[in-house]
Amino acid sequence: MADGVDLPSVSRVARCRQARDFETYVRDTVPLMEMVELYKFEIPLDNSRGLGSAHRIQQMVLPHELFAMLHENYPDVFRKVFATDSLDEWWGHIPAERRQRHPFFDPGRMATTVPLRLYGDDVAIAKTVHCLLLLITSAAAFRLPAGEAYLPVSSTRLEGSDWRTTEEVYKVVRWSLEALCKGKWPATNHLGQPWPPGSERARLGESGADLAGEFIAIIWEICGDWKWLAEAIGFKQQRRYYQCRDICHKCGAQTDGPLSFRGLDYLAACFFQLQSTQSFLQAIDTELSKLPGYDVQDNSRTDVGKASDRRRTDVGVGQTSDIYMYQDTALFDWMHTSALGIELRANGSALMEMATEGRWGRFGGEFKVRYGIALKRAWTDFKTYCSAHGLEQKQPQFTVITLGMAAGAEGLPELKAKARNCMHVTQWLASLTRNDAADPHSRNRSRVLWALASLNDTFLSAGLWLSDDEAATVDRSSRILLGAWTRLRADAAGTKYWGTIPKHHAAMHLLADAVASRRNPASYWCFSGEHIMGVSRRSVAGQYQIGVDNRILASSLVRLGLICKRSALASASSVGSASGSAPGRRL
């Protein structure tokens, strides 16, 4: 009611299951929100068994239409969401040659060119019900609330679908992003067919009008869960993700042999075999691999950054190419790489070792009993630490099961935890072991935990761009992390403790790029995206009917509508009238 919105109406929209009711409900609920007309198209389904329909209608919010609507009707929201006041500064941090190699970048339009990020992940609504969510955000935006930073594009139910289903969705996304790059209303639909005569889309397309005045948006990067990214971009060598031999899209790292990813050293052979743009483009084969900027027609550009030109001479953290590399658009994410990767292994190994050493007491009995008691005491200590430091956490109790040790001493120690909880566990363990120096192994364990906590703290406290001191901290912490982990792994030979995983290799690329570019990895890590996934999951809790994907999209747009309404009311209040908040052209 504080927003002037009838809550029962909001609830009615949240329960909306029928596409035919959606737009009416939303307009009744959020009258100031002139909604973009949902784009409807047909997607194929997996009908190999002859059961059900072979097609269904998919709905989407076209990125270029959402961009145009916000610019015309809600300029304050447009300015905030796309960070238009800081575009000049953002592009100024990108080396000139790198940005100018992007096929759609115009150096004369830096202040009006939005670097766009496409985000994707699947939402598990139930054990057998999953939806693929696609979102867009500005790469120049930083520390915005998740609901404002990430704008909805589509929600696709994955049950009954196959690769053709998502490819059709990506085809529409690619077409819309091309329109954004050009800044003009498209004259035809995604199939190249003319718009229905007399429609607003036909009128705008025929006129060749600008989407958002002088503003355009170019696709600059893609981020999300790596499983989704590998599928969506279509890395041929990573169709089985980390079970295949070639595991990296940026260099020649392999699972074993002379180019093994297990060498935690920037002098490792794989870092001398950097992917060329041409080899990268040849290794991807999906609709998203044809995104604007990927589908290079100019032959002079396909050799940009070839491996022989990018061979490192004085190899070390912070060395990277200054040119725009297509393979660099697929981002490694610190949340998935560290908090849901390296730190799970580090915390699991450290907790089990410290319990074995009697940090929380020594107990008799079988494996599960004695470690269960010690780990429960550790969990109590962790909760006390979080309370004392004002850290919110919902970490389940430490047990041999939550540490992956149900099989006994031969188990693989890996903490089961959500990303934020895992970072808090790392911080606690780093504090607990900071003075450990009884032996080299204890010192190295302390160094690993300190380095991980230091990196997390630096990324959380830094701005969009790292200062020289912050970059030096990242450089130092990364070297300590890699060196100490290598020694811990050698100490643990013959066990599964301190194992090296492909995410160590991903972290090396991520940290090297952060030091070189000064860009804070927190500006593109997936915490906000994961928050949106959680909100979407809760918005359809207990509802597993066919229209669940439409309901997720409806809920996302209602939230955006309320943000726009708040902005309009705030603008009207600041000038003492409602001028400027009136709805504009509807699409």
Specify the residue positions occupied by each region the protein language model found.
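Well-ordered, non-membrane alpha-helical segments in soluble/globular domains
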Residues: 163-176, 180, 274-281, 368, ...
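Glycine- and acidic
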Residues: 148-164, 361-368, 408-415, 434-440, ...
